[in-house]
Amino acid sequence: DYIAIGKFKKNKYKNILKGIYKGCKISSCYLSGGETAEMPGIYNKDKFDLAGFCVGLVDKEKILDGKKVKNNDLLLAVPSTGLHSNGFSLVRYILKIKNISNKNILKELLTPTKIYVKEILKLHAKNLIHGCCNITGGGIIENLPRILSANKAVEIDLDKIKTLKIFKFIKQNNISDAEMLKTFNCGIGFCLIINKKNLNKVKKVFPKKFKPYPIGKIIDFKSKKIILNGKIKF
């Protein structure tokens, strides 16, 4: 990890590290090292910049490269906890323009990102997934094509997506459906592609709050990688 901070404050630094350690523990990974830079000339005393990355290993034959994805495979949505650290530039703009200071909304915006590592590793070990992707910046529109081979596409029923209150709030501020889909996860933190016969086995791996559910299926590619039907019920 890397932390740049305006003025070193022990308690604040300690809380930041606690969060990093907690994330590593949930992900079953180690914090191998890091750097802390105190930069008063760059950052205000109460500001900090945090960055980090993870490196993993996988056997070549176990890489999910899209080759396992077949026609009529199910596309599953795994619920998110909120924004998952994406789309905050647009959200800050809305809060500023509308002069919003509702504590419930602000608290919901700070809901920690769900980390799916343990569930995904269990599914992968049992050979239950053909493809998967984290829904971050770009939403389902930009992230799903990355896990599809050149000859496959996905058909999505938007009306099956179970969105969250925070996205309903954002949508109410004159944000188009297209902008919502390309900026936010809209309630989907992770996507899985599986054989439909394995649906119940896959669902059992997740706790109740994060049970995956079908929102589409795999089809042959014709002209678009993502075919959208219906509308999200914001």
Task: Locate each region found by the language model.
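Glycine-/charge-enriched secondary-structure boundary and capping motifs
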Residues: K12-S32, Y43-F48, K98-L110, K114-F234
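Short, compositionally biased
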Residues: F88-N99
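Glycine-rich anion-binding loops of enzyme active sites
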Residues: D1-F88, K217, K231
